[in-house]
Curated annotation (Swiss-Prot):
Keyword annotations of the record: Isoprene biosynthesis, Lyase, Metal-binding, Multifunctional enzyme, Nucleotidyltransferase, Transferase
Cofactor names: a divalent metal cation
Site (Positions MEP for the nucleophilic attack): 139, 191
Pfam families assigned: IspD, YgbB
Gene from which this protein is expressed: ispDF
Annotated segments matching region 2-C-methyl-D-erythritol 4-phosphate cytidylyltransferase: 1-210
Family label: In the N-terminal section; belongs to the IspD/TarI cytidylyltransferase family. IspD subfamily. In the C-terminal section; belongs to the IspF family.
Gene3D superfamilies: 2-C-methyl-D-erythritol 2,4-cyclodiphosphate synthase, Spore Coat Polysaccharide Biosynthesis Protein SpsA, Chain A
PANTHER family: 2-C-METHYL-D-ERYTHRITOL 2,4-CYCLODIPHOSPHATE SYNTHASE, CHLOROPLASTIC
One of the protein's GO biological processes: isopentenyl diphosphate biosynthetic process, methylerythritol 4-phosphate pathway
Classification via SUPFAM superfamilies: IpsF-like, Nucleotide-diphospho-sugar transferases
Protein name as it appears in the record: Bifunctional enzyme IspD/IspF
Organism field: Campylobacter jejuni subsp. jejuni serotype O:6 (strain 81116 / NCTC 11828)
InterPro entries, alphabetized: IspD (IPR001228), IspD/F (IPR026596), IspD/TarI (IPR034683), ISPD_synthase_CS (IPR018294), MECDP_synthase (IPR003526), MECDP_synthase_CS (IPR020555), MECDP_synthase_sf (IPR036571), Nucleotide-diphossugar_trans (IPR029044)
Catalytic reactions on record: 2-C-methyl-D-erythritol 4-phosphate + CTP + H(+) = 4-CDP-2-C-methyl-D-erythritol + diphosphate; 4-CDP-2-C-methyl-D-erythritol 2-phosphate = 2-C-methyl-D-erythritol 2,4-cyclic diphosphate + CMP
Amino acid sequence: MSEISLIMLAAGNSTRFNTKVKKQFLRLGNDPLWLYATKNLSSFYPFKKIVVTSSNITYMKKFTKNYEFIEGGDTRAESLKKALELIDSEFVMVSDVARVLVSKNLFDRLIENLDKADCITPALKVADTTLFDNEALQREKIKLIQTPQISKTKLLKKALDQNLEFTDDSTAIAAMGGKIWFVEGEENARKLTFKEDLKKLDLPTPSFEIFTGNGFDVHEFGENRPLLLAGVQIHPTMGLKAHSDGDVLAHSLTDAILGAAGLGDIGELYPDTDMKFKNANSMELLKQAYDKVREVGFELINIDICVMAQSPKLKDFKQAMQSNIAHTLDLDEFRINVKATTTEKLGFIGRKEGMAVLSSVNLKYFDWTRL
């Protein structure tokens, strides 16, 4: 049995997919797409090593200890070159995680022809009339190249060392004078590029699990600046001490959302030792945090917030706070509730030394079936 390693490319920005969630994090059941695709291929062969390129290594490592992860580059070629640094097997199979339904039959065709050339690649024939600049092409000579592809590792490394931009491994190998062998591709191995492609593939739908997160934050009064809660000015001078603008509600809510998604906490994302966050707009930081949560496949169900303050009174500001949160997070206002309470003059809150906020949120997987 030939020694083969597997590289799965999962560091793309999903620009053409045109949704808030990166396509590699779409959920198929409970698995993100990148994991589902990798499990599928890894079930076909005892690979020496499996390497996944990533734009979020810390988060992806939470799903499995069976693979190695490496930060991707700005392009496919850069990501592949970095991943190849971890590969020492004679052959390497490379696939895009967006080709999620590669079959065992296609996989076997690649393996069976391993000794035929320097790169073995699946290809589809073109059935439709094809024009280039309004001139008909000979469709018999056209091939639609797919992945996975198997290459001789040393030759692929040498090809990528040219620092040219190749869109797949076969063109890189061919540029080095290497021999390419084509096997029959398949419709199910078409790349998931646009959101409309989801309707063409028979994929498992997202799980209906709900993920709950809580966030708690406390700040002391003492800054002669506006007191802000959810970006709403509550008082012109009763500001809270903080590295940022002191919006304790926004901080609490940010922590709750990050926690529900398993993405750490606000201190990791926006450390108070970083001067670029000095006096930062906390509602803008909240939006950025939620964008990260959406990128990895989640969306908000509802938000419930309890503000604890002896003073000032917040009754007249709750509606404005709810509206501002809804606008910032692009969420229906009926899904947001803001409550206010005192501590009956007990503790530091009762002594009017500061205030605290407890936020709770529920997330669900992004439902791509609605697209």
